[in-house]
Amino acid sequence: MALSWVLTVLSLLPLLEAQIPLCANLVPVPITNATLDRITGKWFYIASAFRNEEYNKSVQEIQATFFYFTPNKTEDTIFLREYQTRQNQCFYNSSYLNVQRENGTVSRYEGGREHVAHLLFLRDTKTLMFGSYLDDEKNWGLSFYADKPETTKEQLGEFYEALDCLCIPRSDVMYTDWKKDKCEPLEKQHEKERKQEEGES
């Protein structure tokens, strides 16, 4: 299975690289300790576009999302603390992502199956993307994240260029709206509780 995945990705490389030079951002690279350091901390979900209908439906309800990545380099896992606003309510969830270093992917079990995403970087180090089904033209898609809730025109431009590489219309992009976030109070409460626990220990 892993071998067939690698062969499929390798077969895509000439296609991706033959297009706009920025398509190189869609070529998965191995995840290193430096990579894990780079993604550590707080990230905001900005936008996404998927051809996969299941993923499209799941993101339509999202009004705002931010999360924290805390990697464990020894166990190749990432502790995820996620704050998501849907239907004007805050939903908090914590879980672990598995890191597949050689494939450049992270995965999470949800709904009884494993969801895999490629970790992709843009030129701006304050942004990142996750690519889904990059070996399946009928289902592939991208989600875009930044270290702040609002992005610059240049940052969004890089995301759009990546979508162009996959021939996904920009009209298909779904955006979040930080003004609709309902989770900031809960985040502050959690932060206060953590500081109290640290003080007691």
Swiss-Prot record:
One of its GO terms (biological process) is regulation of immune system process. CDD domains: lipocalin_AGP-like. Pfam families: Lipocalin. Keywords: Acute phase, Disulfide bond, Glycoprotein, Pyrrolidone carboxylic acid, Secreted, Signal, Transport. The modification Pyrrolidone carboxylic acid is found at Q19. Disulfide bonds join C23-C165, C90-C183. Glycans are attached at N33, N56, N72, N93, N103. Expressed by the liver and secreted in plasma. It is found in: Secreted. Belongs to the calycin superfamily. Lipocalin family. Contains a beta-barrel that binds various ligands in its interior. Functions as a transport protein in the blood stream. Binds various hydrophobic ligands in the interior of its beta-barrel domain. Also binds synthetic drugs and influences their distribution and availability. Appears to function in modulating the activity of the immune system during the acute-phase reaction. This is Alpha-1-acid glycoprotein 2. It comes from Homo sapiens. The gene is ORM2.
